[in-house]
Amino acid sequence: MGDEKKAAIFVLVNCEIGKEREILEKLKNVPEVTEAYLLYGVYDLIIKIEGESNDQLREVMLSKVRRIEGIKSTLTMVVVEGFARKH
């Protein structure tokens, strides 16, 4: 997860039909969202949110992400441990 960030979550998002790209653009305005991708399958988007604590991540989800118009539902997964390869 990076040295400056202590907590991360991945969020699977279901969007209203046709709103996927619009929501992806709006997520660019949420600084804690460090990655976001359109998907094919059961979910429409996956996003990664990083912050200083789980409390901060919860606040970002409740006050910023979940309030974006067109988001129908989310499934949040809390990162416990991991690594990332730099290419």
Regions found by a protein language model. Name each.
Residues 1-87:
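A compositional/biophysical signature of low hydrophobicity enriched in polar/charged and small residues
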